[in-house]
Curated annotation (Swiss-Prot):
Function: Key component of the proton channel; it plays a direct role in the translocation of protons across the membrane.
Stated name of the protein: ATP synthase subunit a
Gene3D superfamilies the record matches: ATP synthase, F0 complex, subunit A
The organism of origin for this protein: Geobacter sulfurreducens (strain ATCC 51573 / DSM 12127 / PCA)
Subunit architecture: F-type ATPases have 2 components, CF(1) - the catalytic core - and CF(0) - the membrane proton channel. CF(1) has five subunits: alpha(3), beta(3), gamma(1), delta(1), epsilon(1). CF(0) has three main subunits: a(1), b(2) and c(9-12). The alpha and beta chains form an alternating ring which encloses part of the gamma chain. CF(1) is attached to CF(0) by a central stalk formed by the gamma and epsilon chains, while a peripheral stalk is formed by the delta and b chains.
Compartments, as annotated in UniProt: Cell inner membrane
Family: Belongs to the ATPase A chain family.
Segments traversing the membrane: 25-45, 86-106, 111-131, 142-162, 181-201, 202-222
């Protein structure tokens, strides 16, 4: 899906020497746009902190507080060090999903490259956290409780862990890309009132997919923190 926006044209020209497709360049452009927007919102919210929050500070405290509560409920106290990572991913995925509801914009999460990058971050973080917590004993997570089944369990666990980034990326990509295609069809058939319910459903889908991505990231990291049996 191509949109003749100036910043998209800029990124296409900028990335042309790398032979990146227009769809890939657009996804990169929207990704950077979202990053800049989140940074600006963060700066505005923290520019003049007050004991009694108002405006943007109040809004961001509600959002961040909600994510923090979910991290604590899912991972407990030991999940607090990983709250910044999980909150960053959750906000990025959510805003990436919602931006597609703005006419003329396309969600970067409807591009497989973006969702794969987010999934790889979760995958690497999971194992880095596990190795940092348990050292070489982290390998026991892949061996299972019965020593003579260790080779078979290791093979099965490796496949299971490698499938995680695949399922994370494909689930988010499939849902967001599918919604965009349905929305395009409805806009083509009836560009006025009919697409409105689909856009409202898009808000719900955006929140659900961001929540699922965040929840799975928490579960994977939580699993790497647990002692192997």
């Amino acid at each position: 899906m191509v949109h003749p926006l100036l910043f998209l044209q800029f990124f296409r020209k900028l990335l042309e020497p790398l032979h990146i497709s227009e769809a890939g360049a657009d996804a990169i452009a929207y990704t950077w746009l979202i990053i800049v927007c989140l940074l600006i919102v963060s700066l505005i919210a923290t520019k003049a902190l007050k004991a009694v929050p108002t405006g943007m500070q109040n809004f961001m405290e509600v959002v961040i507080g909600g994510i923090e509560n979910m991290v604590e409920e899912t991972m407990g106290e030991k999940g607090k060090p990983y709250f910044p990572l999980i909150a960053t991913l959750a906000l990025f995925v959510l805003v990436s999903n919602l931006i597609g509801l703005i006419p003329g914009f396309f969600p970067p999460t409807a591009n497989l490259n973006t969702t794969a990058a987010c999934a790889v971050i979760v995958f690497l973080s999971t194992h880095i956290v596990g190795i940092k917590k348990h050292g070489f004993h982290y390998l026991q997570h892949f061996m299972g409780p019965i020593w003579w089944l260790a080779p078979l369990m290791f093979f099965i666990e490796i496949i299971g862990h490698l499938s995680r980034p695949l399922s994370l990326s494909l689930r988010l990509f499939g849902n967001m890309n599918g919604h965009e295609l349905v929305l395009m069809i409805f806009f083509a058939l009836a560009p006025f009132l009919v697409p409105l319910p689909m856009m409202l459903m898009g808000v719900l889908v955006s929140f659900i997919q961001a929540f699922v991505f965040m929840l799975l990231a928490m579960i994977y990291i939580q699993g790497s923190l647990e002692e192997a049996h």
